[in-house]
Amino acid sequence: GGPFQCNLRTLVYGGGPMYLADLEVALETFGERLAQIYGQGESPMTITALSKARHAERGHPRYLERLASVGTPHCVVEVAVRGEDGRALAPGGIGEVCVRGDVVMSGYWNDPAATAAALRDGWLWTGDLGAFDEDGFLTLKDRSKDLIVSGGSNVYPREVEEVLLTHPAVAEASVVGRADREWGEVVVAFVVPRGTAPPVAELDRLCLDHIARFKRPREYRFVDRLPRNHYGKVVKTELRKELAGG
């Protein structure tokens, strides 16, 4: 037991969601060697960072909240969370993460329409939804295109996935919306079981104990694997296509 011993000093992670359940396992395995960087190709590796020192602050009263964040803004950029009207939101407000600085791209090659959509008034609109806390730590909620609107209420898939992954029989989970005549969209969870698939009633109970009832999946689909791209990210468009095809 305990972290393994080696000459490895730092292990940097990023490029996709790091679920809290997985991060806690990584800390148990590697010790306090972990650091996180959040960036995009349009603003490479320079939006926020969560340092090794922050990973080691186990005694802090908001340790788990900070661990679930992507850290604080890098010194070379300005970062803001903005609403649909373009105004910066106060701490706690969920909106789109926007970045400004010399490292931000000047535009997409030969694609003025995409450039105009992404760059507005000098700010890069990243397509990521998130919120700052009072101490300047940024927590990502989801990609804006993956947001589920059910009965007029927003459901952030990652919040549901985080809960499902706490079940010992769930190895992986990915949540998407399915079109619904009554609700607009309903929540569907694709689950890769660890061995035998867990009873749906257990997953329902787990969700009801941790999140609002309207966020609970209406359907669970147990699969052998989730579709991923060459970066290892889950391709949710493929999951939505599967639902659309029945």
Task: Name these PLM-found stretches.
Residues 5-8, 170, 217:
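Core-facing hydrophobic residues within beta-strands of well-ordered domains
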Residues 35-42, 71-73, 176-178, 221:
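Beta-strand->loop->alpha-helix junctions that form or flank phosphate-binding loops
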Residues 64, 78-79, 129, 225:
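Generic short beta-strand
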Residues 101, 106-107, 117, 129-215, ...:
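AMP-binding/adenylate-forming catalytic core of the ANL superfamily
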Residues 1-64, 78, 85-88:
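Gly/Ser/Thr-rich phosphate-binding loop
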Residues 15, 39, 71, 128, ...:
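Active-site glycine-centered loops adjacent to acidic/histidine catalytic or metal-binding residues
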Residues 56, 69-76, 84-117, 155:
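Conserved ATP/PPi-binding loop(s) of AMP-dependent carboxylate-activating enzymes
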